[in-house]
């Protein structure tokens, strides 16, 4: 079993435990009743539709490929730094075992910043989508590799019903077709292969032509330099998601400024 399969399986176990505390029907009702102007009218999508390249900046304490990234995880301070530096959205890891994430990180960050947040986790059950909205997320991640085409379409419709967005993550040509057929409005190409953790930023360039222009195109992972950003701009991406590069920067504002202005 590769790491992606392990992450998906652990998500199923987490959901089963969460359902013992709050049932699916209860979680649905809470999500439907959750009112927040940052969650209305697909704020995440709107933030990515502005002119030029949008930046999604990630808060994460660790990762399976890099281990512990930030022992002293000042997540609220980091989120504030990102917002002050001009980030358009914030990605918050909530997966607890391999990424050392927490639902509380998302809940507190979403309350603290004025820009939209995405719950970065391994969605394997509709429960997690409703849960994400109650935590303050304006978007969720849907990974084609761990979902059937039927699930993907269903989960996008649930997001639509809640007024939140979905980044549909793809890794290859087959998944690109799956995402387009499911009526995804935001498609992210992960330049990191989650099965073996190899990184190839050319993956975004390779898959770009398969995505219609009316779909928001996001390049994810492996972005380290101004040269990487230039390539991403050249292929016509609408947004880029940057994690480790910013997390390891002593001056996050300076690093984001450097990348944004390249």
Regions found by a protein language model. Name each.
Residues 10, 60-62, 95, 122, ...:
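Active-site beta-loop-alpha junctions enriched in small/polar residues
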Residues 131-150, 188-197, 235-255:
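Glycine-rich phosphate-binding active-site loops on the catalytic face of alpha/beta enzymes
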Residues 124-135, 173-182, 219, 223-242:
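Catalytic cores of alpha/beta
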């Amino acid at each position: 079993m590769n790491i992606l399969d392990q992450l998906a399986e652990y998500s199923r176990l987490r959901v089963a435990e969460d359902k013992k505390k709050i049932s699916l029907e209860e979680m649905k009702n809470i999500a439907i009743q959750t009112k927040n102007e940052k969650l209305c009218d697909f704020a995440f999508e709107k933030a990515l539709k502005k002119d030029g390249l949008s930046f999604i900046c990630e808060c994460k304490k660790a990762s399976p490929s890099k281990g512990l990234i930030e022992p002293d995880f000042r997540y609220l301070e980091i989120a504030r730094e990102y917002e002050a530096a001009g980030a358009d959205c914030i990605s918050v890891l909530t997966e607890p075992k391999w990424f050392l994430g927490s639902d509380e990180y998302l809940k507190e960050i979403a309350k603290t910043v004025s820009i939209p947040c995405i719950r970065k986790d391994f969605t394997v059950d509709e429960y997690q989508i409703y849960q994400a909205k109650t935590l303050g997320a304006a978007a969720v991640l849907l990974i084609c590799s761990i979902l059937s085409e039927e699930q993907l379409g269903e989960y996008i419709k649930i997001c639509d019903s809640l007024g939140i967005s979905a980044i549909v993550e793809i890794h290859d040509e087959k998944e690109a077709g799956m995402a387009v057929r499911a009526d995804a409005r935001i498609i992210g190409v992960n330049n990191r292969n989650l099965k073996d953790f190899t990184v190839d930023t050319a993956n975004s360039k390779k898959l770009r032509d398969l995505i219609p222009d009316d779909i928001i195109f996001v390049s994810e992972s492996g972005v380290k330099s101004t040269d990487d950003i230039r390539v991403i701009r050249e292929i016509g991406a609408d947004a880029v998601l940057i994690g480790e590069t910013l997390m390891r920067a002593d001056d996050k504002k300076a690093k984001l400024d450097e990348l944004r202005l390249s």
